[in-house]
Amino acid sequence: MSEFTLKTRLLAALEGKPVDKVPVCSVTQTGIVELMDKVGAAWPEAHTNPELMAKLAIANYELSGLEAVRLPYCLTVLGEAMGCEINMGTKNRQPSVTASPYPKNLDGAVVPADLLQRNRIPAVLEAIKIVREKVGPDVPIIGGMEGPVTLASDLISVKSFMKWSIKKTDLFEQALDISAEAAIAYANAMVEAGADVIAIADPVASPDLMSPETFKQFLQSRLQKFSAGVNSVTVLHICGKVNAILSDMADCGFEGLSVEEKIGTAAEGKKIIGDRARLVGNISSPFTLLPGPIDKIKAEAKVALEGGIDVLAPGCGIAPMTPLENVKALVAARDEYYA
């Protein structure tokens, strides 16, 4: 089966087809300070400048060996285009939402007709095109973005999101519907620009914040709508110990489910989802990849591979201060497993 390219291998793995070896990449954020310095493309400029955005994204493929190019580096691009106020962060801190446009009601809340021309969306789409031109057709590009649940909480504020989920469910559902619509439009624009996989991170959907009952009753249908509406392979990442919702996540229609080490072993995760979706992860970003040492990274990777992980990856966004050699160790672990 040596006819695989990086792209066909990743897509086959996510679709549950046989592959010669498990791909190793990151479906979550990949910008690390060491690479910013090496290639001269640093945050926060790389969040707005398409050339720098592309350069930094390509660096983690070229210099660490991750088998996909993933961009951008935050979960605020769509929120900003929908009216959220953003703090653009620093060289080692990601952008974050600082103010929500609709904390009291949804008067005037719609998906703007010019959504794809707003704020940083054109820069992301341009960066994807630059990446494709530079890496050629055989390297997969992963477009990352906030999921509809997290977007909804950004639009109305986390406080209102929690409150409305119990007391004003009509408004809660309206916020989710607007967010799903905007998310599908942005995702498909990334696909059109050249992304092969769309990976959404939806931390607000985690049982840490929303009950499994709320997930089942309100959130699952919007995630299903998203995966059905996007014209590519999709991956759903939800942070935290998601065991209580993992089976429901597997019914959301995403090819891949990206999980942290908090779920337990890959084998335990696979047991829950069966063949309904593929498991991506679950090497700890904060507790293993960031601090190392290398033998711990390799040992964790081996456990994941032996447990049947479908795509070996960091369990969450790579911490900006993670050393390059630690990311390389993740790739080496996969190579050694098949040696």
From Swiss-Prot:
GO terms for biological process: methanogenesis; methylation; one-carbon metabolic process; porphyrin-containing compound biosynthetic process. One of its GO terms (molecular function) is metal ion binding. The keyword Ligase does not apply. Zn(2+) is involved in coenzyme M activation: in the absence of coenzyme M, zinc is coordinated by a single sulfur ligand and three oxygen or nitrogen ligands. In the presence of coenzyme M, one oxygen/nitrogen-ligand is replaced by sulfur, probably due to ligation of the thiol group of coenzyme M. Keywords: Metal-binding, Methanogenesis, Methyltransferase, Transferase, Zinc. Zn(2+) binds at H237, C239, C316. Its EC number is 2.1.1.246. It is an enzyme of class 2 (transferase). Its cofactor is Zn(2+). The keyword Transcription does not apply. Changing C239A: Strongly impaired methyltransferase activity. It catalyses: methyl-Co(III)-[methanol-specific corrinoid protein] + coenzyme M = Co(I)-[methanol-specific corrinoid protein] + methyl-coenzyme M + H(+). Belongs to the uroporphyrinogen decarboxylase family. MtbA/mtaA subfamily. Methyltransferase involved in methanogenesis in the methanol pathway. Catalyzes the transfer of the methyl group from the methylated corrinoid protein MtaC to coenzyme M, forming the substrate for coenzyme-B sulfoethylthiotransferase. MtaC can be substituted by free cob(I)alamin in vitro. This is Methylcobamide:CoM methyltransferase MtaA.
